[in-house]
Amino acid sequence: MKANGLDNDPARTRMERTDIDSEHPEAQPLLNNNHRTLGAGSANGPAVNEGRDIESDGFIKDSLFQIRKGYRIFIHNSKWILNILILINTIWLVTTLISDFFFNINILFGFSNRYASFNDLTLIFISIIANSFNLWFNKLGLYSALDYSLNVTLCVLTLFNLALTYLIKYTRQRIGFVGTFTYLWTSFSFFIGAILDWYLLFYNNSINEPLEERRIDDANISTFNENHTNSTENRDRSQYGSGSPTPTHRSQLVQNKHTLTEWVSIGFRNTIKFLILIFFALFTLNTLLTTLDTYRLTHKLPITVQSPSYEAFHYVDAAKTYQLHITCYGDVFDQENNTDLSENKKQPIILFEHGGYDTGYLSATWIEELYHLDKIQRYCLYDRPGYGLSDSPPAPISIAMVAESLRYALIKDAKIKGPFTTVGYDLGGLFTRVFTAKNVDIVDSMMLVESWHEELLLKNYIQRLLPPGRGDGDDGDDGNGNDGDGRNHDKTWLPSEIERHNEFRLWWKGIWSSLGWRLQTSWLLAHHGSKERIYGRDMKYQGRFLRSKFLESVTSSILSYRDVTNNAESLQNVKTSIVSSKEMVKKSALWGDWQRDLTKISHKTQEWKIVEGGHEIYKYGLGKQQTQEVLLRLIGELGKLTED
C-alpha cells in the first residue's frame, strides 16, 4: 500500500518529470516560461500570451503583403502615366518649336500666342525634365522630404508667374490659350512630382508602422529580460541562435538607412531640382520686371485723341492675327485739305521705319526734333512685329508680310489714309522700299537713310562687305585675319545693326533671355528706365525681340530677298532721296557701291547726300542736321529751316 501510495504521489511524479526534462533538452517547450512570460501569474515573471504573439506576427505579415501589393500597383500605374506625359511633352515640344519658329501650326486649330518668345519652349523643356525625374526616381528608397518641398515650391512659382502675366491687360490679352496652358502644364508636372512624393511617404510610413509597433513590444520585453541572470541569457542564446534581424532593426533600416547608390541618386535629383529652382527664381524676377515695365508703358493706352498725339494698337488683318503698336504726332487723320490751295495744303505724313536693333524711340529722334521745331506737321512711328510693344508675329515672317500688315493697320484699322513720305533707316530701308512699292498710290516720296542693300540679306554678305586690307583683322582663319581672298576680316568696325548674328547664336541668346539677367542689370547697375528695356538700348535682350530676329534671319535669304527684288520696278517713278554715312563709305568701298546702287532704284532720285558721322547718324550733330535738311528738301519745306 505504501509503495502504491508513493507511486501515486503527485509531488514525486513532478520531480521525476523534471529530472527527465532536464536530461532531454529537445523535449523542452519552445518558449521558456521563466524568460518570455509577462504578467503577475508567473513566479519568474508575467505569463506570455502565445496566441496573441502568433496572431500579431500573422497580422503584420498580412498587412505588409497588402501594402507592398498596393505599392507595386502604384509604381506600375505611375510609370504608365509618366511615360504618357513625357510622350505628350515631347510631341508638344516639337510642335511648339515648329509653330513658333518655322510654321504656325496652331493657326490650324484657331490658337494664337501674340506674346510668344522663348519662354514657352523653355517651360516645356523643364516640364520634360520634371516628368523624367518623376519617372526615374519614383522608388521607395529614394524618397526625400527636400524633393517634396522643391516640387511644391516650383509648382507655386510657376503659377505665380502665370498670375503676373494675367495681372495686366496687355499681357492678359496676348498670351492666349497656348501660352496659358504651357504654364499650367509645367506647374502640373511639378504637382505630379509632389503627389508621387506624398505616396512614397505614405507607403514608407505604412510599412514602418506595424514594424514600429512590434519594435515597441520587443523593446518592453527586452527591458524586462535585462533583469535575468547571465546564465539564463546564455541558455536562451544557445537555444534560439543568432537568426535574422529583428523587426526593430528592419524598421530602422527602412527609415534611416540608404545605400550609397540611393544617396547618389537622391543627391543628383535634388541638385538638378535646386538648379531648376534657381532658374525659376530668375525667371520670376524677369517676369516681374517685364510686367512692371509693360504696365508703366501701356496702362494709359490707347490714346485715341487725334491731336496732338495718337498711340494705340491696331490689327494687321481681318482675322485679328496680331497687333502693331503705332504712335503718331500731329493731325494724321485730316485728309480734307489735300485739295485746297497750295499754301494751305497739308504736308505728307512722315512714316518712319526703324532699324534692325532699335525702334523709333532711338533712331527717330531727329524727326521728333523737326516736329518740335514745327518744321514738319505730322509723323508716325510703328514697332515692327516683335519689336517694342508690337505683338509677336506668327512664323514665318518676311518683309512683304510686314508691309501688307502695316498697310492694313494704318489704312483700314487706324483709318490713317496718308499720303505718306516713307523714311527707312538701316534694315528698315528694305521694309520701306517694299511698303512703298506696294502702296505707290498713297506714298508721295521715299527717303533711305543708311539703308541696307538687298545683298545684305544673303548669307555670305559679310565677306563681300569687308574692305581689302593687309591682314590686320582676325577672325580666326589664319592668324592674320585673312581667308585667302585678300580681304581684311576685322569685323570690329561693323555696326551691330549690320553684323548679322547667325541663327544658332540668336537661338542661344533667346534661351538665356528667359533668365533676364541682362535686363536686371540694366536697372540695378545702369539705372535704365522702362522705355529703354521695352524699345530702347536694352530691347535686344528681350526674348520676343530675339525670336523676331531669328524669324527674320531664317527667311532673309529666301522670302525677304525675293520680296525686295520683285518689287523693285514699282519704285521707278517714286521721288527718292538717299543719305549715306561718310565713315561707312570710307571703311568699305562695297558699302559705297551699294549706296550708289540705291540711287538708281528710281528715275526720280532727288539727291544722294553723304553726311558726316557713322552709321547711327542720329547720334552725330552735323550728320543729323544734314539728314534733316535732306528730308525737308524732299517734302519741299527747307525754307522754314533756313528762315529760322
Swiss-Prot record:
Residues 112-122, 169-174, 293-644 are vacuolar. Residues 9-26 have a biased composition (Basic and acidic residues). Residues 239-251 have a biased composition (Polar residues). GO terms for cellular component: endoplasmic reticulum; vacuolar membrane. GO terms for molecular function: catalytic activity. It is a multi-pass membrane protein. Residues 1-90, 144-147, 196-271 are cytoplasmic. Keywords: Membrane, Phosphoprotein, Transmembrane, Transmembrane helix, Vacuole. The chain crosses the membrane at residues 91-111, 123-143, 148-168, 175-195, 272-292. The modification Phosphoserine is found at residues 22, 56, 63, 244. Its main location: membrane. Residues 1-39, 225-251, 469-492 are annotated as: Disordered. It comes from the Eukaryota. It is found in: Vacuole membrane. Residues 348-619 form the AB hydrolase-1 domain. PANTHER family: SI:DKEY-122A22.2. This is Uncharacterized vacuolar membrane protein SCY_4679. It comes from Saccharomyces cerevisiae (strain YJM789).
